[in-house]
Amino acid sequence: MFSKFTSILQHAVEALAPSLPLQEDFVYHWKAITHYYIETSDDKAPVTDTNIPSHLEQMLDILVQEENERESGETGPCMEYLLHHKILETLYTLGKADCPPGMKQQVLVFYTKLLGRIRQPLLPHINVHRPVQKLIRLCGEVLATPTENEEIQFLCIVCAKLKQDPYLVNFFLENKMKSLASKGVPNVISEDTLKGQDSLSTDTGQSRQPEELSGATGMEQTELEDEPPHQMDHLSTSLDNLSVTSLPEASVVCPNQDYNLVNSLLNLTRSPDGRIAVKACEGLMLLVSLPEPAAAKCLTQSTCLCELLTDRLASLYKALPQSVDPLDIETVEAINWGLDSYSHKEDASAFPGKRALISFLSWFDYCDQLIKEAQKTAAVALAKAVHERFFIGVMEPQLMQTSEMGILTSTALLHRIVRQVTSDVLLQEMVFFILGEQREPETLAEISRHPLRHRLIEHCDHISDEISIMTLRMFEHLLQKPNEHILYNLVLRNLEERNYTEYKPLCPEDKDVVENGLIAGAVDLEEDPLFTDISPENTLPNQEWLSSSPPATPDHPKNDGKTEVHKIVNSFLCLVPDDAKSSYHVEGTGYDTYLRDAHRQFRDYCAICLRWEWPGSPKALEKCNLEAAFFEGHFLKVLFDRMGRILDQPYDVNLQVTSVLSRLSLFPHPHIHEYLLDPYVNLAPGCRSLFSVIVRVVGDLMLRIQRIQDFTPKLLLVRKRLLGLEPEGPIIDHITLLEGVIVLEEFCKELAAIAFVKYHASSTP
């Protein structure tokens, strides 16, 4: 009480006293602080009971006032005094000793405000960056301390200054010659953390510092906000207390630099206070984005950042329940790291494991965004660490297990992170994890060369329909990602040589036929016994397609040798016989909807594939190795096999199989278009295409229709029930077959629309 009265009295005296020159006033306040340590006999009293906080605040105000009164870049006498007399070094020593109690907090506040409010560059000065380095080491020593908030504020302002002038980061890379394996663990970090912070508990052994930059005081100024951006009020406490799993013991000599700023931030990411942890994550994101190569190398090789990311991912993944409903995993709201506040009591859609799932997805989003923002070499190193330590080390065993419930949950989680990833570098590693790096054509004997790829593709035809659907969904979303290797690995590498075709050199008579719009050797569908229902009345006129097409474009060029689009369109539309069609009995199920959707989706795919520089036309057959045995590849083999069983599979499975095939058909590659969408391609003996698979299904269907009484009325009733136009009633015989026929009809309409839209786009000048 007496000390507070003394402080108030001193303020009053200072206010009434005549104003001194700024430098004298500054020196007065500094000496008042030093005299306290000389004269005081009670070093147990808290610093808040002394005048020290007031004197520090006055010193700061004087420095700001001095800078405002001078020209930009000019160092005043007060700042010169602070630098020359190593005031920051002295304050660091007092803060480290925390004498009087609470002094560390006051020192952190002073450093933070000094760096934030002074506009001229201070960090290049050796008497600034050296004590700043030392103070950084004190941050995060012990978690949940009273100074945590001040520590993170200080670290964040340092990060902001480095973001403003990235070259300054070199001052914070310290030489370190000790072996990691021989070091003890400082008490700041738990046992599971990699060693390597030899200077956390002492300021001795300080590395050789770069000399003060000449002319630093004359550098061009850049305005920086007084305080770094803060969003703590609404940030969640969800970067939970899950401890990081045990890390391997280091057995090699650590690279010769230390990055204590990163180490301190890493410590604080483990804070029980979620707001502190989030701010530490923000600081790390600033640091990884710095363009300095030396900092990027040190970041990934001399700190445990890679281990922090991957081991926390592993911890959060392992904390998930053994079984989570795939629908819950798929539909849980979008997760943004740091904003995943969650209250089980307030959540009407809570389910077991939701808290753990949100925490995992939130941390995965942080890793994704961190890699997305990181300097190039740092991003690659971080992504490879996630690949090796999390994807392979944790996820792969779960995906390769034999328990159906485990397979379903792990595949649903893989599907979710495939949807969520946005970083190109992390996506690349995820693709290599799922598919492998192989680019040579597949052979049937080597389809299991990459075990995980083989297992996942096999799961597309699993005995469990749920597993099949979830795996197909995962591949469908994977195909929508902007990565060329995905489609090449799954499909294109097997179509490069076009050895699915049989090469027949054109004779003079054939050339005349081609000029009339037909392909030599192609089967005329009107003469095929499977298509006896084709007549001028039930084919779709070309004019009708044109009227339903995407927005008008300039006139198409004359026939360039392609099969005319209306023949291709009608080939798909007439595949299903009239007796098996039901869409024309129901309004709103016409092909025009497919045209609009196909146009939009094709445009999106073209935008994705533009940078891949695909050819505009198929590779010339003369240059193809047609003698090589053709294998469509494991992925298409499974899809074609499932397509061939469309009349005997559940409705939901059929929808997913046809959805993946239509996605593949949309890609603007000439070989994919030819193989999946050209009914007139001359298939080599023993080869099949999507069209030939459907033809076989239709042949089977026409035989089976004859054995089902009242087939057409039953088919129409099933369609209306699927559309919700009829209430559910008694079970209908042959329901699986009837639903399969409906999916088949809709799929053929969709393929016809895609073929038309792609032709329309390629014919536009």
Swiss-Prot record:
Region: Disordered, residue numbers: 193-236, 532-561
Entries under Pfam families matching the protein: DUF5917 (PF19314), KELAA (PF19311), RAI16-like (PF10257)
Superkingdom of origin organism: Eukaryota
Bias-annotated ranges (Polar residues): 196-208, 535-550
PANTHER family, alphabetized: FHF COMPLEX SUBUNIT HOOK INTERACTING PROTEIN 2A, RAI16 PROTEIN-RELATED
Similarity field: Belongs to the FHIP family.
Task performed by this protein: Required for proper functioning of the nervous system.
Protein name per the record: FHF complex subunit HOOK interacting protein 2A
